[in-house]
UniProtKB/Swiss-Prot annotation:
Gene symbol of the encoding locus: rimM
Pfam families tied to this protein: PRC_RimM, RimM
PANTHER family per the UniProt record, alphabetical: RIBOSOME MATURATION FACTOR RIMM (PTHR33692:SF1)
SUPFAM superfamilies membership: PRC-barrel domain, Translation proteins
Protein name: Ribosome maturation factor RimM
Length: 189
């Protein structure tokens, strides 16, 4: 191993979180003192700092990391990770996802949903037509939008369908037990 890579000691290797959820990503080094630039995937960008512990995967090994400091520089956050003391070590962490266990998420009301819970759900219309699976969700200023990968043999001959996440108007029912979302939507729209 090179001296300038982030090192993994045998005693640092740990059991990964039982229910891992990616909440951000290290996108590169910042400066020469081991700071890293991060991208937050949380609804409010600074919510990423309300969790602990954090995990990353380095060289196919789970590693718990500790954030000693963080700062907002422009519109991006920089973070000082304990044990990362130079630019090369920081750069070796580029593209590592920042992971927590989902048990750290706050409890939510019955009519609220985490995006992670909707990904993979099957989408059907109120007429009972199977559209496909939710593969991602796009956040917009007006409303969120479900990206549905359509079934291969769909009648509409389209690959993906965008469905506005409008409860009651378009989204008629969400059942996380059966992993189904019922919509009143015409994919040709």
């Amino acid at each position: 191993m090179k001296h300038d890579e982030y090192s993994i000691n045998k005693e640092d290797v740990m059991i990964p979180p039982l229910h891992p959820v990616v909440i951000g990503r290290i996108i590169g080094a910042y400066g020469i003192l081991g700071w890293v630039r991060i991208l937050s995937f949380t609804e409010k960008n600074d919510n990423i700092f309300y969790y602990s512990p954090y995990f990353i995967i380095v060289q196919s090994t789970w590693k718990e990391i500790f954030l000693d400091k963080w700062k907002l520089i422009g519109k991006r956050y920089i973070v000082k990770i304990r044990g990362v003391s130079n630019r090369n070590s920081a750069q070796s962490l580029s593209r590592c996802n920042i992971i927590i266990d989902e048990t750290q998420f706050p409890c939510i009301n019955d009519d609220e949903y985490y995006w992670k819970d909707l990904i993979g759900c099957v989408v059907i219309t109120v007429q009972g037509v199977l559209l496909g699976d939710i593969i991602s969700i796009i956040e917009t200023t007006a409303n969120d939008v479900l990206v549905v990968k359509m079934c291969q043999n769909n009648l509409y001959k389209i690959k993906n369908c965008l469905i506005p996440f409008l409860i009651k108007r378009v989204i008629k029912n969400i059942n996380l037990v059966t992993r189904t979302v019922t919509v009143d939507w015409d994919p040709n729209f």
